[in-house]
Amino acid sequence: MIYIFGSGLAGLSAAISLHKSGYKVTIISKKINGGSSYWAKGGIAAAVGNDDSPELHKIDTLEVGDGLCDSKTVDYVTREIRYVVSTVEKWGFKFDDDLRLEGGHSKRRILHKTDDTGREITNFLLNLAKKKGINLIEDKLLALKVKDGKVAGFITEKGGSFDAEKVVLATGGYGYLFKFTSNPSTNIGDGIAIAFKAGALVSDTEFVQFHPTVTTFDGQAYLLTETLRGEGAILVNERNERFVFKYDSRGELAPRDVLSRAIYDQYKKGHTVYIDLSPIEDFDRKFPILSNYVKRYGKRLQVFPGVHYTIGGIRVNTRGESNIKGLYAIGEVTDTGLHGANRLASNSLAEDLVYGVNLVRYIDNWEGLSIDDVKEVIEVRLRNSSNRLSLEEIREYNWNYLGIVRNGEGLDKLVKIYESNDTFNDNASLVSLLSAKGALLRTESRGAHYREDYPNKSWEDGKRIYFMVSRN
């Protein structure tokens, strides 16, 4: 039996692929239909157009990743996604015929299903998993059992203790640890914290991606997909100034980190920022879901950057293998090196599918993550304390000190807060500590990580920060 924790795109695609090859699979998830995949609006980046190629997709990914992408991983994903997309289509999923353009991409390569791709494909895979008879259980992972560097099992809240030689973590990221986010409340980094406490290597936790255009409908955060700007939507302030070209010559199609800081700067200067959807031709047909909201709210919507994706996580190789034998990790819970310092739009669902569908190739042929080339690992001591912050306090702290623009004074304060907190029992505090500590240590600005006291890129390309739990 192979146990997969998480029922988003990565977990479901892995389960179906394994099941089709004859493996017994059980999916365990805090909420079967509650992950981030449902909220992905744009689509899946794949070089399937006649004027496109994996090499061009790779170039765009490396450019946006700002010197921190793992070239081998980028090669793997940009090449394999075309095969994986055809596999999912053979399973019965149908993408819309047209390819769309998003920020940072040099070609139209975004495969989509209406303007709600994440929900459409995740629902399809969930229904397929149910039809295949794959066991789906709602439960919460509490701990991994590891013996002599190998997975021995796990403990869940309801089910108790289980023995297992192979565990797949697909539990998502930690975006809900910030006050303003497009992520669901399940995304608090549990999988990362549990793996870390078990001895897994964790990296790149300082890189938190803010999506530039989040709005609110009916009091709820709503992601306004990158595709809107690819189809002609523009950003303006209350003076109707199209301000983005002051910050980047690519305008509305600049990478997310650039636009997020530009919008943040506009608000800091006293302006209000809107996205104007009126230039989009045939809007109702292209964006039928959003169109329902626009009929009530209009085509000029106030926007603000919100946390959308967390780049750091469990360090894995291109096979989804961690440094603990038998522990695989796929999806946003990982740090594969694909995204570098900043994720290219619609590469996350591509990564989910490539690592999920292809896991079957490696499940019986363990190689493990090689850490021989890791020059320095920072050990972090866990604290068992009665001092415990509420989740809302953590979200407020992270938004204030670990947000779009950071500085050493705020980060140092934040690290000290979490170091005095219960990081042994509280996963949210532990992951927040790793993120804040990474941001404090990275004394430069790169990609999604911006330090106003170190505004320039100064570290050598490829240098990343690794954490491991201290056993002393």
UniProtKB/Swiss-Prot annotation:
Its EC number is 1.4.3.16. The active site is at 256 (proton donor/acceptor). GO terms for cellular component: cytoplasm. It is an enzyme of class 1 (oxidoreductase). Its main location: cytoplasm. FAD binds at residues 7-10, 36-43, 190, 332, 348-349. Catalyzes the oxidation of L-aspartate to iminoaspartate, the first step in the de novo biosynthesis of NAD(+). Belongs to the FAD-dependent oxidoreductase 2 family. NadB subfamily. PANTHER family: L-ASPARTATE OXIDASE, L-ASPARTATE OXIDASE, CHLOROPLASTIC. This is L-aspartate oxidase. The lineage of its organism: Archaea, Thermoproteota, Thermoprotei, Sulfolobales, Sulfolobaceae.
